[in-house]
């Protein structure tokens, strides 16, 4: 959540950030401006009424001590108190309206984030590893998966519905090996391995920004205040919900392997075949909580940690700086890692590493104490990596002419 003080004192800065995101909020933003104007006016009136109440109360006390008639002053105090209570209630209601709007306003766009309306304006930063030149036409992963008996898409549909899969046989061993490899690399880079619940309450999803704006994107448990997690970012970040951390304990670096669940609302017709876009998928996540001065360096650290895994698996990839119009709700700055998929002849996202600055920390009340003063921490999150998409990339990049899959040396010890 952005700072309410900023919204009240520099509304135009917030409006400009929304414009950069290609998200002007239209009439809603103007209505918010009107509410803020009324709220500020009422605060000034409240100050005046309170000052008057204090002044008359003092006079009332003096006259009472002097045993002088105070009936007029008493009436003034009573009338003023009624006005105070009414205005205080009205201001409180306006404050609630502002806070509700605040909860659906996305993070401020970082100065380093380039301007752009959509993903077409994203900027490639660098490429790592050169894509292999095939002497045959490479197949897509769903063909290879079925040929090798690694993934059973039909059974996924039978057990649930479309966008679910069953991984079995040697494919399941590869899948498990990828998870172990990812966790080992992340731990080597200083991230504590944590296993968390796959269900969270509404407060936790508010803390990381999924609620209230993106309610349709998450699965809710019927008759319970519980939701299936869309990412371990939710659980790892909220381990420190409403917590004050000693500055000596920063940064906090965490990694978790979890199943993730997403409704994929608005994705109809996209990636309908294979494992690219699923309702349930596994992901190894990185989350860091840092001092504000250290979050930029941490973002680079997290990117390199994810890139190390792809290099070990001999998978060509690139870093892409997202433009302002392609940023996620809670992100101030995001760099994607895209992996090369020869079957599709393009790069596809396999990790997004985002710096949320103090946006999530303000929502979740994640603070640190330095010099006897509580301050908001910075939070970062990123995949390291999406397991299914890594398996997709492995199949497509390491396929042989006969459809078999070469297994990278880095995975051998896990098989």
Predicted regions mapped to residue ranges:
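N-terminal alpha-helical targeting/anchoring segments
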Residues: 1-132, 150, 154
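TRNA-recognition modules of translation machinery and tRNA-sensing kinases, especially anticodon-binding
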Residues: 127-415
């Amino acid at each position: 959540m952005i700072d309410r003080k900023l919204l009240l004192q520099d509304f135009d800065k917030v409006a400009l950030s929304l414009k950069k995101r290609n998200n002007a909020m239209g009439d809603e933003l103007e209505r918010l401006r009107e509410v803020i104007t009324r709220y500020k006016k009422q605060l000034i009136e409240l100050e005046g009424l309170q000052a008057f109440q204090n002044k008359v109360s003092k006079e009332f006390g003096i006259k009472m001590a002097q045993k002088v008639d105070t009936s007029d002053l008493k009436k003034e105090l009573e009338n003023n108190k009624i006005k105070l209570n009414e205005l205080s209630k009205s201001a409180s209601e306006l404050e609630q309206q502002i806070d509700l709007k605040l909860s659906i306003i996305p993070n401020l766009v970082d100065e380093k984030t380039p301007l752009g309306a959509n993903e077409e304006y994203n900027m490639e930063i660098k490429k790592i590893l050169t894509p292999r030149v095939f002497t045959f036409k490479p197949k897509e992963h769903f063909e290879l998966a079925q040929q090798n008996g690694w993934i059973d898409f039909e059974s996924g549909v039978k057990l649930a519905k479309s966008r679910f899969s069953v991984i079995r046989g040697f494919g399941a061993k590869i899948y498990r090996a990828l998870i172990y490899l990812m966790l080992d690399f992340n731990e080597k880079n200083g991230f504590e391995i944590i296993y968390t619940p796959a269900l969270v309450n509404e407060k936790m999803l508010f803390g990381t920004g999924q609620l209230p704006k993106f309610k349709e994107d998450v699965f809710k448990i019927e008759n319970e205040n519980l939701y299936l997690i869309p990412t371990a970012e939710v659980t790892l970040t909220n381990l420190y919900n409403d917590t004050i951390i000693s500055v000596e304990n920063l940064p906090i670096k965490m990694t978790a392997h979890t199943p993730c669940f997403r409704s994929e609302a608005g994705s109809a017709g996209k990636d309908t075949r294979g494992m690219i876009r699923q309702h349930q998928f596994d992901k190894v996540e990185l989350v860091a909580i840092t001092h504000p001065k250290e979050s930029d360096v941490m973002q680079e650290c997290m990117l390199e940690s994810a890139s190390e895994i792809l290099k070990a698996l001999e998978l060509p990839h690139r870093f892409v700086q997202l433009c302002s119009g392609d940023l996620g709700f809670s992100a101030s700055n995001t760099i994607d890692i895209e992996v090369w998929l020869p079957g599709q002849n393009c790069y596809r996202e396999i990790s997004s590493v985002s710096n949320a600055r103090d946006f999530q920390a303000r929502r979740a009340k994640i603070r640190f104490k330095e010099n006897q003063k509580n301050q908001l921490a910075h939070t970062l999150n990123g995949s390291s990596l999406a397991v299914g998409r890594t398996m997709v990339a492995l199949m497509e990049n390491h396929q042989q002419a006969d459809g078999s899959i070469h297994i990278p040396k880095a995975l051998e010890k896990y098989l």
